[in-house]
């Protein structure tokens, strides 16, 4: 009888088989299962019920539940011809989890998982088994307190699988990086040269300011920060400041964007529109001498030209004979060209002279129409008085 019993056992369910059955009894430390097609009942110890820690079997199963498990051992009593299948539901869940995670790793897919615990080195998550997100793989940004993730469902990617050592490493940072790259590509495609947009000063260097314009940084060169001369970016902008910028150029291959704050600001000449008129006599300061005349600043950042013929009633060979930089002078406005931002001035017309000589209108016309040699551009006409102006 015993020999027949042993032979039937060998031909029956054996160790390593996968079986199904119905939960008949839930005890404190184990679950009794009626095995479909089996000669005995199955026993699932509490430690083999779940991939997670549980204090009671009732947390995961109840009587009448259909369960699937691996047979880890077959026990039988030859004398009484009784036995039991020792089962592991945990082993089967772990196997399914690894299979699922391997597929996601192979396809570089995103999964969602709940953070079950926050530890010093990172986050513990539930991915069908215990998974770990190291601190270095939590975010692309610095996060001081990881407790904000406790209990949250997060989007992650599988970074590493090692079933032999029961090791599952995941990355939330990889998902963020992928999303940031997608936003960056979309933004780069939507931007065009000449667009005026808003951004935030991200960092400052000696040569300019980097502006975050929505996931992409663009550079405002120090020469594009203001109409007036700027020594260092800190003179006009600060980190975190919201600014308006104009896109000067885009290189989508290298993801380099050149920006300008200066181009979004009114020029010094625009700031004085309506303030001065032809024939007004005003005060100014000599800022530069040239062979053909003197440049006089009549308002912060605005310079006009006094042609050499308009400096004195007497003939002079060079402006330096009667003028020097820094000298205060009275000037009369002979003409204003708003389109080209030019002002023609005369010192001579403000000086007393018994034999009054009228200003030569051809000289004024030549300057305003850009016929003089070495005529200044708007850059030549910008002084340094607005250095301390903040945007």
Swiss-Prot record:
Domain of life: Bacteria
Example GO biological process: translation
Disulfide bonds: none
Molecular function GO labels: mRNA binding; structural constituent of ribosome
Classification via SUPFAM superfamilies: Nucleic acid-binding proteins (SSF50249)
GO CC field: cytosolic small ribosomal subunit
InterPro entries per UniProt: NA-bd_OB-fold (IPR012340), Ribos_protein_bS1-like (IPR050437), Ribosomal_protein_S1-like (IPR035104), S1_domain (IPR003029)
Ranges of residues in domain S1 motif: 16-90, 108-173, 194-262, 279-348
Keywords recorded for this protein, A-Z: Repeat, Ribonucleoprotein, Ribosomal protein, RNA-binding
Stated role: Binds mRNA; thus facilitating recognition of the initiation point. It is needed to translate mRNA with a short Shine-Dalgarno (SD) purine-rich sequence.
Family membership: Belongs to the bacterial ribosomal protein bS1 family.
Protein name: Small ribosomal subunit protein bS1
Organism: Staphylococcus aureus (strain N315)
Gene, per the UniProt record: rpsA
């Amino acid at each position: 009888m015993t020999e027949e019993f042993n032979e039937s056992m060998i031909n029956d369910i054996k160790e390593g088989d996968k079986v199904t059955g119905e939960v008949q009894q839930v005890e404190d430390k184990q679950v009794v299962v009626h095995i479909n097609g089996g000669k005995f009942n199955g026993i699932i110890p509490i430690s083999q019920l779940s991939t997670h820690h549980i204090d009671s079997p009732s947390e995961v199963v109840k009587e009448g539940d259909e369960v699937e498990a691996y047979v880890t051992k077959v026990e039988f009593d030859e004398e009484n011809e009784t036995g039991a299948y020792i089962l592991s539901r945990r082993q089967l869940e772990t196997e399914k989890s690894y299979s699922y995670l391997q597929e996601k790793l192979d396809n570089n897919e995103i999964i969602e998982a709940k953070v079950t615990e926050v530890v010093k080195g990172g986050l513990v998550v539930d991915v069908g088994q215990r998974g770990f997100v190291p601190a270095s793989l939590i975010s692309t940004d610095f996060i001081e307190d990881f407790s904000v993730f406790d209990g949250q469902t997060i989007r992650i990617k599988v970074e590493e699988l090692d079933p032999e050592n029961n090791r599952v490493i995941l990355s939330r940072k990889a998902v963020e990086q992928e999303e940031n790259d997608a936003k960056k590509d979309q933004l780069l495609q939507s931007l065009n040269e000449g667009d005026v947009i808003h951004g935030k000063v991200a960092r400052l260097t000696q040569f300019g300011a980097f502006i975050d314009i929505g996931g992409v940084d663009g550079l405002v060169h120090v020469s594009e920060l203001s109409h007036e001369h700027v020594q260092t970016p800190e003179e006009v902008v600060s980190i975190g400041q919201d600014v308006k910028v104009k896109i000067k150029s885009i290189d989508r291959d290298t993801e380099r964007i050149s920006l300008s704050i200066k181009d979004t600001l009114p020029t010094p000449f625009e700031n004085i529109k309506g303030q001065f008129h032809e024939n007004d006599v005003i005060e100014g300061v000599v800022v530069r001498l040239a062979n053909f005349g003197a440049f006089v600043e009549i308002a912060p950042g605005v310079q006009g030209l006094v042609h050499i013929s308009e400096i004195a009633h007497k003939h002079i060979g060079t402006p330096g004979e009667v003028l020097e930089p820094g000298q205060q002078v009275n000037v009369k406005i002979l003409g204003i060209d708003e389109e080209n931002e030019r002002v023609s001035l005369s010192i001579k017309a403000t000086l007393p002279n018994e034999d009054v000589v009228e200003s030569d209108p051809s000289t004024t016309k030549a300057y305003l129409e850009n016929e003089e040699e070495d005529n200044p551009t708007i850059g030549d006409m910008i002084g340094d008085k607005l250095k301390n102006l903040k945007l």
